[in-house]
Amino acid sequence: MRASWVAARKGQANVSQLHFARQGVVTQEMDYVAKRENLPESLVMEEVARGRMIIPANINHENLEPMAIGIASSCKVNANIGASPNASDVAEELKKLELAVKYGADTVMDLSTGGVNLDEVRTAIINASPVPIGTVPVYQALESVHGSIEQLDEDDFLHIIEKHCQQGVDYQTIHAGLLIEHLPLVKGRLTGIVSRGGGILAQWMLYHHRQNPLFTRFDDICEIFKRYDCSFSLGDSLRPGCQHDASDAAQLAELKTLGELTKRAWAHDVQVMVEGPGHVPMDQIEFNVRKQMEECNEAPFYVLGPLVTDIAPGYDHITSAIGAAMAGWYGTAMLCYVTPKEHLGLPNPEDVREGLIAYKIAAHAADIARHRPGARDRDDELSRARYNFDWNKQFELSLDPERAKQYHDETLPADIYKQAEFCSMCGPKHCPMQTKITDEDLEGLEKSLKSKGKAKLSA
């Protein structure tokens, strides 16, 4: 679809959506997004130009179906997949991608760290994906020197970053906000640094006694990104990994740097979103969202969860979806899903499904709470189907039709029960929705009360 769109742009010094928007140009991607989001083209262009919306759309990802991340668009969900040195292969990752797209992932991140040819799995994922693909390039940078922090140099980082752009990666998590002066702030934490990328950069700075190379070479990265229209996802290396560490000095110091980097990227006309926590008590979520908007000039916020309690391993898709719904309500643009395997192991395809459905619920609930036009239409349609005992319509409108039908059919499997005016919860005689109050019923009741000298029915 996009091959003809991007053909004329290739070779230009800057092909970013932000660059075109600031020139007053509505690209085909902006037009496509406007139709998907039911927004005016002019508003999409203005939001992209302002930096409040991004359209991650690498010119080399030609089978991409463009989408938007920003406060003016619907709340989005990202799904993480990826192979590790201990598990998975290319076929398994493609199966996860297929499931992620099927169950509504708006973007997918390939977080592969080893165990496969990283270029092979990434290229396969990009070629198969209609949604934007994100990566964390420091993983492959370290893998390229066989895990040796000592041998890892600045050029290794930039080489891998450009390779990902060439392959068609739409956004990259760049951990440029972690500075050497932030490291002492970590000492008082309960769980230290929990970001893998942040941990790699911290080790690099401690060994080489030099500033974070992703910070010192940030302008060089911007020059790379604008040639491909790759977007920044500014990584939060110091995100809290437990309730105890939420909103601490380390997290907020890095956030301030991320705000400065946002402006530097914008100066190059490069698109930016900013990553956020993590593990945050419910009473601190609004503060975290507002603080990011303030420090980062309303660049789209992209949060992992946040988890609102730390005591439920195996159920962290639930503990985090609670926080995600709240974060989305307060203005977060994209939610990174958490699966039941979080903190325990690499997710399998069923974990991907469970995590995604939990987060589609959270994002949809946020859109309703934000009074996004049309957000509740599907809810109302399903409710009408429920009231009319239209079981097949209910299944069709569900976020997970297969699960809804499976649960219904466990007790009432025969097709005849798809026309029944009850389910197995209440049975045929006790379903309250069988009580239909008509105008004739109310007229008769009104007359009866009047004849008995009783008070009128309330309006």
From Swiss-Prot:
Pfam families: ThiC_Rad_SAM. It catalyses: 5-amino-1-(5-phospho-beta-D-ribosyl)imidazole + S-adenosyl-L-methionine = 4-amino-2-methyl-5-(phosphooxymethyl)pyrimidine + CO + 5'-deoxyadenosine + formate + L-methionine + 3 H(+). Substrate binds at residues 80, 109, 139, 175, 195-197, 236-239, 275, 302. Keywords: 4Fe-4S, Iron, Iron-sulfur, Lyase, Metal-binding, S-adenosyl-L-methionine, Thiamine biosynthesis, Zinc. Pathway: Cofactor biosynthesis; thiamine diphosphate biosynthesis. InterPro entries: ThiC, ThiC/Bza_core_dom, ThiC/BzaA/B. Binds 1 [4Fe-4S] cluster per subunit. The cluster is coordinated with 3 cysteines and an exchangeable S-adenosyl-L-methionine. It is an enzyme of class 4 (lyase). GO terms for cellular component: cytosol. It comes from the Bacteria. Its EC number is 4.1.99.17. Zn(2+) binds at residues 279, 343. One of its GO terms (biological process) is thiamine biosynthetic process. Its cofactor is [4Fe-4S] cluster. This is Phosphomethylpyrimidine synthase.
